[in-house]
């Protein structure tokens, strides 16, 4: 059979002419045009394939043989409409540049490409897609799998509205914007399908208001890692929970002991232990050689029993036991921490040191006082007693150690940290109000001899109590002018305190919902992972790191290929989204996990 090409109207069509009894010719339209499928935009190999298939089809028809099933699905010759001539018949659309004859870089850069997204056609240039060669559309080898030689275009059965943002990513040089009519989970799925990369995904999360998940660093040494997980993360294992329970009990015992030892009955008993009564002195002997000896003997019982009686104090024993546990816990955590510098700068670890430090100072002071001649002068004793009281007060900070084991206290701390600006404004407004109204009430009550305000600084207390709407009543205005000032002070205090409160409450709700959503997401991820393992759907496409808890596992791997994405691997293992809005995150998680096997969501 002989195949020859004849020019059509556009100068690039072809006509088949067969020889012998199997000769076949191109189907001509009434106007004399060729009705064969357009081939001007195809490369040489595609043209040969199309012509060979068409000739085989006609030979089979002339020989009276039935057509094979695949051959029956080939498009029949038809006349091109005006739209087809403008769109599909355009020789510049959908050209596969990797199979064409060599062209200069300028013409290849401006060559047009036709992309069909579920029936909606987009047109762009090769140079636009080539800006990101590692993506699906930017890599000629990757996008070749989606090329349709019959329609001369790239076809993707994906979400149509999302492609506006994907194409804008190429046109703008890397700016990713989600269309308003596309949900977050659908657009995130499209980003992964078109393989825009992790950097584009991170920028998308930041633009949408998502927070980057904090990475928990772990020590490299296996033994240190296990110890760190046990003492730092109570939810990592059963032994970690046991250690956390013991730590909480010790903290509570220490706080209860700190409070009980101030009761009058216990305080009097401790004073008796510390300073036992001096036994009655015998009559003074006559002056002589034995006088100094008897004086020394009379002072002996007041010094010797002090040290053992102090160590025998039950509160001292309980306090020593608690401090031993706190010291052991702090040293173990310091030994196993991944970074000594970060450990030293952590506020919670500073609180641990502050909670332990007073005990050793108190112990050293007690031992110094028990030494012969350590009593010293009364002035030194009063000074050491004042210092001890301040140091012992620091022990109350041990209550903050509970925040390590309480999510609620952690949320409260993050709320206060995020609201420092609002709290500063609140204190500044209160300071202005206190100065203003204390001065006003002083001068309003100055002529009254029974006034409670002797000076402006003396009126500061009244202004603070009134602005905070506490009103103890120990200081109050008497005159009419003073009462008017007091009324204005109370109203100003209510308005001043009410202004920053909504912002603080909003921050608290934000951190609270973020924590609860994170727990739900981790539980959902763990449940879905268990289901996949039970059904045998886990493949070797991801590298898994073994650890004590699923929440501490990190998954990684290369970008998915288009086939694996079509099969619908779980997107939650590759994209951890944390939203400011609880509703957005719940909707995203539900949509992502409800049906991961679908290819498009219109």
Swiss-Prot record:
InterPro entries: BTB/POZ_dom (IPR000210), Ion_trans_dom (IPR005821), K_chnl_volt-dep_Kv (IPR003968), K_chnl_volt-dep_Kv1 (IPR003972), K_chnl_volt-dep_Kv1.5 (IPR004052), SKP1/BTB/POZ_sf (IPR011333), T1-type_BTB (IPR003131), VG_K_chnl (IPR028325). It comes from the Eukaryota. Disulfide bonds: none annotated. Pfam families: BTB_2 (PF02214), Ion_trans (PF00520). Residues 523-536 have a biased composition (Basic and acidic residues). Residues 261-314, 369-384, 443-456, 477-483 are extracellular. Induction: Expression regulated by cAMP in a tissue-specific manner. In primary cardiac cells, levels increase by 6-fold, and in GH3 cells, levels decrease 5-6-fold. This is Potassium voltage-gated channel subfamily A member 5. It comes from Rattus norvegicus (Rat).
